[in-house]
Amino acid sequence: MSHHRLSRRGLLAGTAGAALITATAATSRAAAAEVPPPDPQWARPPHQVEAEMLVDYLRTLPWSEQAQVNRYKTAGEFPDESSSAKWGAAGHPEQFSVLAQCSSFLTMVLERTYGANSAYGWATKEYFSQYFHTEDGKLFPTAEKFRTGFADAAETPHFTGVTKPVNLRPGDLVAFDYDSENTTEPYTGHIVMVKERMGTWASSVDSQVGSNVVPYVFEIVDCTSNPHGNPAASDSAEAIYRAFPDTRIEEHVGATPEWTEHNGAGYGHIVFYADATTKLFAGYRWDVNSSTAHTAAERPIAAARVYPR
């Protein structure tokens, strides 16, 4: 695979080309969706500020150090270590760390921001147990429990449901189940926080969800063992990846292998599909280079917005 580097001008031109592809390949569905541009005016909610602070400080560390303090808690590993997310003092990135799965990471972000020691006081273990049904013996709800709670957000204090990808704002949480036969062990699904809506990106893979869908790309914050993107997936994958990167993928210029995947908390990009007619969630794709997309019927999706007060 080549090490062709895209200039900012080239990258913007490539993005413009992608927009043209979207408009040409999916004119009817894009027109029906009335896709708005990204809105820079939404203020980041407090929990997004806290999540990004943690990720950004960890990113300032060398890769070798990040690998020791920013880790995904893979099932069966780290039996003697509890899930944790630690925020340090300003200017001390070495004091920040993560050892978590997707749901425990975002639960700890909410607990830090709105928990008993905050000005808000509601995001406690008791709250998550009552409204997101934390399983006996567990400290955090699973992604599956979050998805169920978001789907019933009208009955969940401090959350309101978001049923359409086009309405997602920075800080909103989106959870989806994995296949029904695999929703108990070891992983039930995945949950992410929206960082920014990036626009749409059409692909032949979209047809796996349906012929009348709109593929919205979102930059997200999450904790995962599988970064969102594979720059080595195909001859064209590197250029696309550079437009929609993941902070957990390390590049080795001029070396073999050229890329190393890391895990833990970071930023990536995911595709959420909307039905062009109803605007409701229709499915998702893990990243813009993924060759597989999943329908919402196959893997249910629900999203919610946090209201601090």
Q: Can you say where each PLM-predicted feature lies in the sequence?
A:
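...with weaker cross-activation on analogous glycine-rich loops/strands in unrelated enzymes
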Residues: A123-P227
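N-terminal capping segments
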Residues: V35-H133, A274, K279-R309
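Residue-level marker of regulatory loop/turn positions in helix-turn-helix DNA-binding domains and
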Residues: H4, V98, T184
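Hydrophobic h-region of N-terminal signal peptides that target proteins for export
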Residues: A19-T24
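C-terminal segment of N-terminal export signals and the immediately downstream linker at the start
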Residues: A26-P38
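Low-complexity, Gly/Ser/Thr/Pro-rich intrinsically disordered linker/tail segments
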Residues: D222-R309
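N-terminal secretory signal peptides and thylakoid transit peptides that target proteins
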Residues: M1-A18
